C-alpha cells in the first residue's frame, strides 16, 4: 500500500478526477504530524486561508506537535488534533472537511459513526453512503452531540422530526461546531452549553479533555490526571489570530494591535460584574483611524461599529445605547464574555425556518407556571410550545428560559474557520452581520456591513 502524506495548509488542486477514480486499497492518506516527521512548528508560521493568513503563538516558544494532544488514546484512531487542527484555527472548517473526505474517500479518523454521521446507525459501507451519512459534517463542519432529556425539566418533548429516525428523549441529536482549542485563557465556560464544569477553568478543561477522549475518540479508559493536565497546559498556551489580510497587509502595521502574540500578553480576569462600555471597548485598530490606506480605515470603522452601534432591544423598539456587540462580547479584543453568560441570538420561532434538511426538529412544551415580565405581563403561558433544532443550555439546566441559549465564543481567527455560529449556519462573515440585523435588530447600511466584515476578517 502506498501512503501519501501532506500538509493540509498547502494548496491542493484536483483536475479531471474525483475520489471515485481512486482505488482506496492502493492509497492511504495520512495527515498525522508524526508520520510527516514534524515535531513542531515555529511560532507565527503563516497558515493560508481565503482572506489572508493566520498564525498561532505558543507560550512554549514553538507549537509542539508531538505531545498528548496529538496522541491516540482511543479505539478509532482519533486524537484531539483530529477535530482541532492548527491549519483551521484549531477547529475544523467545512471546506477542509470536504477536501479531507474526497482525498480519503471518507475514511480519515474524522469520519466516524459515533459522532460524525447524522445518525450513529448510518450506513457507511460505500462511498456514496458515506457522502450521505456525513452530510452535516461536510456541509456545516458540525459534530453530532447526543444528550438526553434532563430529569425534572420544566418542559417536555412533544415530538421529534428526525430524517434519520434516531433522535428520541433518551438521546437527542444536536449538531455543533467544534470550538477552537486556542485562546482559552479568555473562556469562563467550557463547551457551547456549559455542561462541563469544575472548581476552576483548568479543572473544567481537564474534564473536557477526558470526556472528549472517551466520547469522540472512544477511549475505553479515562485519562490519568497527569495526561489531562499536559493536554490543558498545551491548549492554554496557544493563541490564534489572523496575521495578514489580503489588501490590508499585516494586522500590526502602523501601531495596530492585531495578530496572535498580543493575545498572549493580555491578562483576563473573570467577573460576574459586566465591565463598563469603555472597559470592554475594542482598540486593536485605533491607530488606523486616519490611515492613508482606505482598507485600513474600513477596518477601524468596523471596529467602531462593533463598539458603539446599538440594536433595537426594548419592548417599544427603541435603541438602547448600552446594547452593542460588546454587551455580549465583553472580553476586550478576545470576544468572549467575562461573566460566562448564555444567550439566544436567534429568534426561537424562526429556528425551524433555518433548519438544514438533515437536522432533527424538536417540539417542546412548557410545563411550568406562567412566566411574567417585570410589568407582570405573562410572556410564556403554561403549555406554550416551540420548535427548535438545538435546545442548547436548556438540556443542561432543565429550564425553559435556557432554550436555544449558548455561550459566547471567542471571535478571533474567524477567517480560518468558517462556517459560523454553534450550528455552522452562517457560511460567511457577511452572513453573520446579516443574521444580527435580522434577529437582533441591528441596522447597517451596505457600506457599514462591508466595514464590519473588514473588521471581522482582521481578527
Predicted ranges, named:
Residues 9-10, 336:
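Enrichment for repetitive, rod-forming helical segments
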Amino acid at each position: 500500500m502506498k501512503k501519501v502524506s501532506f500538509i493540509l495548509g498547502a494548496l491542493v488542486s484536483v483536475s479531471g478526477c474525483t475520489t471515485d477514480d481512486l482505488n482506496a486499497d492502493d492509497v492511504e492518506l495520512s495527515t498525522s504530524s508524526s508520520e510527516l516527521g514534524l515535531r513542531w512548528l515555529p511560532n507565527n508560521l503563516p497558515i493560508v486561508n481565503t482572506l489572508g493568513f493566520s498564525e498561532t503563538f505558543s507560550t512554549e516558544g514553538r507549537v509542539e506537535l508531538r505531545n498528548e494532544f496529538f496522541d491516540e488514546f482511543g479505539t478509532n484512531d482519533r486524537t484531539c488534533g483530529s477535530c482541532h487542527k492548527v491549519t483551521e484555527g484549531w477547529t475544523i472548517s467545512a471546506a477542509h472537511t470536504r477536501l479531507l473526505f474526497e482525498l480519503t474517500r471518507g475514511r480519515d479518523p474524522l469520519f466516524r459513526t459515533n459522532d460524525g454521521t447524522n445518525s450513529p446507525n448510518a450506513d457507511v459501507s460505500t462511498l456514496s453512503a458515506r457522502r450521505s451519512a456525513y452530510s452535516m459534517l461536510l456541509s456545516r463542519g458540525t459534530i453530532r452531540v447526543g444528550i438526553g432529556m434532563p430529569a425534572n425539566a420544566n418542559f417536555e418533548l412533544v415530538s421529534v422530526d428526525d430524517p434519520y429516525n434516531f433522535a428520541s428523549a433518551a438521546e437527542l441529536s444536536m449538531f455543533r461546531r467544534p470550538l477552537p482549542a486556542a485562546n482559552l485563557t479568555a473562556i469562563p465556560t467550557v463547551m457551547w452549553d456549559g455542561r462541563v464544569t469544575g472548581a476552576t477553568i483548568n479543572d473544567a478543561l481537564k474534564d473536557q479533555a477526558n470526556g472528549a477522549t472517551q466520547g469522540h475518540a472512544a477511549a475505553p479508559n479515562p485519562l490519568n490526571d497527569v495526561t489531562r493536565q499536559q493536554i490543558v497546559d498545551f491548549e492554554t498556551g496557544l493563541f490564534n489570530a489572523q496575521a495578514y489580510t489580503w489588501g490590508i497587509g499585516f494586522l500590526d502595521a502602523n501601531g495596530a494591535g492585531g495578530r496572535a502574540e498580543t493575545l498572549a500578553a493580555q491578562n483576563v480576569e473573570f467577573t460576574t460584574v459586566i465591565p463598563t462600555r469603555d472597559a470592554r471597548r475594542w482598540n486593536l485598530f485605533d491607530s488606523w483611524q486616519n490611515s492613508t490606506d482606505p482598507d485600513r480605515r474600513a477596518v477601524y470603522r468596523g471596529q467602531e461599529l462593533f463598539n458603539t452601534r446599538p440594536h433595537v432591544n426594548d419592548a417599544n423598539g427603541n435603541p438602547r445605547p448600552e446594547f452593542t456587540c460588546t454587551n455580549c462580547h465583553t472580553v476586550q479584543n478576545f470576544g468572549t464574555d467575562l461573566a460566562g453568560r448564555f444567550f439566544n441570538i436567534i429568534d426561537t420561532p424562526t429556528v425551524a425556518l433555518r433548519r438544514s434538511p438533515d437536522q432533527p426538529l424538536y417540539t417542546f412544551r412548557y410545563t411550568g407556571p406562567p412566566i411574567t415580565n417585570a410589568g407582570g405581563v405573562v410572556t410564556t403561558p403554561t403549555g406554550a410550545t416551540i420548535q427548535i433544532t438545538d435546545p442548547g443550555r436548556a438540556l443542561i439546566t432543565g429550564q425553559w428560559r435556557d432554550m436555544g441559549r449558548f455561550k459566547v465564543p471567542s471571535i478571533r481567527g474567524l477567517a480560518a474557520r468558517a462556517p459560523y455560529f454553534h450550528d455552522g449556519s452562517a457560511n460567511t462573515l457577511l452572513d453573520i452581520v446579516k443574521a444580527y440585523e435580522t434577529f437582533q435588530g441591528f441596522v447597517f447600511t451596505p457600506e457599514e456591513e462591508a466595514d464590519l466584515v473588514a473588521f471581522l476578517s482582521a481578527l
